[in-house]
Amino acid sequence: MIQLRDIDKYIDKRFQRTFILKGINLDIEEGEFVTIMGPSGAGKSTLLNILGFLDDASEGEYTFLGETVHNLSEKKKSEYHKSHIGFVFQAYHLIDELTVYENIEMPLLYRKVKSKQRKAMVADILDRFNIVAKKDLFPPQLSGGQQQVVGVARAIIGSPKLLLADEPTGNLHSEQSEQIMDMFKKLNDDGVTIIQVTHSEKMAAYGNRIINLKDGALVKEDPYNQAVES
């Protein structure tokens, strides 16, 4: 699904080049649940943004679903992002002026899905995530955990092949974190490829593989074969 070859990301300033990522080589197969870990400033979020077409590598080759990303037009990149990739952020990124229903519906509006189909898809996702009773509320009326559930629902309503999550449980307490991660595990069991960034070993254990970054470079990979204990 994903191949990264010699990926560099750097900033040139006053005749000095500062590397954020350097020499990243990585393959991720469809259906994996991968965790990216490392200290602050290691380049984790930058790598996630490159994978999600929110940023471009300075050097190297990124292949997604058989397409070489740097050869794609901006329009094509946007289409791939909307059609195949869902994003979940630590800071929810919900629109306070829109209801839960309207926030979840938004990706379908961008994709010009017809009204009747939109209504059916939103109704299905509200039911699936047990938030039908919250559909007319606004984000400030929800708890942090409830807002993140809405964020996950919005991210997957278009049935993405790839879900990217940047510290998805960073602002949540333990019970809420486990709820979100159980949700991710079920999505992964249903075939969604997931790549998450987290500092938490406990949250990392939900995946099957850990990628460690330090100073922008890949340090080592750990298979995570043990089941998460309930």
How would you describe each model-predicted region?
Residues 214:
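A cytosolic small-molecule/anion-sensing beta-strand core signal
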Residues 209, 217-230:
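Conserved beta-strand-loop-alpha-helix hinge in the C-terminal portion
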Residues 2-209:
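ABC family nucleotide-binding domain
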